[in-house]
Amino acid sequence: MNKRLFAACLSVGMLLAGCSAKKSTTVKDGTYEETVDGRNSKVTVSTTISSGKIINVEVKDNEETPEIAGTAITELPKKIVEKNSPNVDGVTGATITSDAIKEAVKNAIKTAGGDPDSFGSDSAQASESKTEKLSADVVVIGAGGAGITAALTAQQDGAKVILLEKSANIGGVSVIAGGPMGINSKEQKEAGVAGTFTAQEVLAHWQSYNCWMDDGQLFYNIANRSGETIDWLEENGMDLVYVGNEQAAHANGFPTYHAYADQSNKLGYYQALLKQFENAGGKIYYQTPAVELKSKDNKITGVVAKSSDTTYEISCDAAVLATGGFGANADVIEKEVGFPLVTFTTGTQTGDGATMSQAIGAGKGKTIQQYHGVTSYSGIEPGSGKDEIAKAIYLATSIWVNQRGSRFAPEDLNYDTALSSNAAATQGEYYFSIMSDDMVKKVE
């Protein structure tokens, strides 16, 4: 009897112990600031918690690129507050910044004594997916510089255009660049430069510099109409200034460079073009990547795109693939290039256009390369603190030797990254940069 009573008491005791273990820890109200690594720098985020809920999130100190991370900085905090959870989808194209913001909020919850995974669990509901059918004359996939200008041109020519952008931002890598190159633009004519060189001469110089590992016909087609394209951009609100040559490394090249007049407003120029597109009747869908091309008898008949809660089936007569390259796709880079590289992208250039077009029978284009800037190797992420050492390796601060241990270039002629890759390209897969301990410590 006593044994049975003891066993019963023990069972009740275990049950009570089990219940008490599930009791949630009280989260302390307050405002918590957490600093984590972002894309370019440290990111400081302020999180306010009240009565067990996230009531405010604010990104404070940071040096993230506004044109790329701006939407993540302004919109992701609102999303976290709305869902009462840091476990929300980030902003496509600003993944690193998004992850930093979410990590900072999670750290704030932990500091307050809470469990980040328990926040929002009661209210989180999966939204129902729906299908919507649309139609257009032209679907432009990608709202970078090429996509926006293509969409606006088609809309101005009387076509009904739908523009799809996989991220929350427009501009693509065009907002990272300093400006376009052009031959025989109005500004060059005013400067007395137009007519002093031809597209064919620029092409010859370009191919020689790139060891003929490019597509000459494609380059010529672009270069031959580059002047009138720049004139068109300016007629439609973009403010460009003819510079000639920006970098000392290009002093012996052709003066083709046109810079954005206001380098702090690069995104604004493309927003102005987009506004014209929308005013003319065009429609843009953000965070809605195209996932499939439809075709019949070797002709495009439609595009399938997906947002977070809607699948769009768009019938069309033509599709413009302005998705960029594959610079943000590490697997494809290693497959095509042969080794890992960290390139300057907005994170959205993952080869979508090639993947979709090849799925319906398109051929694989020529693999081309441009010997221009040098990028970080072996996974050195910008903003990690190690990228400064990487820069010191390929800038004119050290001695370069090839695999035989011989110097192969006058390092002081490589004024910046512009000539580094061209000089190194003749040396095989890799070369060595010799630095002293003092040099490394100085950079660190």
Positions of PLM-derived features:
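Glycine-rich loop(s) and the adjacent beta-strand/alpha-helix scaffold that form part
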Residues: I314-E381
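Conserved N-terminal/central alpha/beta ligand/cofactor-binding core
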Residues: N169, V175-K283, W400, R407
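Glycine-rich FAD pyrophosphate-binding loop
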Residues: Q156-A177
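Core beta-strand elements of the Rossmann-like FAD/NAD(P) dinucleotide-binding domain
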Residues: K133-A136, S308-A318
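Beta1/beta-strand and adjacent pyrophosphate-binding region of the FAD-binding site
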Residues: E128-A146, I162
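Active-site- and interface-proximal helix/loop "cap" or "latch" segments in soluble metabolic
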Residues: K23-A124
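A conserved short coil-to-beta-strand element within the FAD-binding core of flavoproteins
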Residues: Y286-K299
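An anion/pyrophosphate-binding glycine-rich loop and adjacent beta-alpha core
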Residues: A354-M356, G363-E444
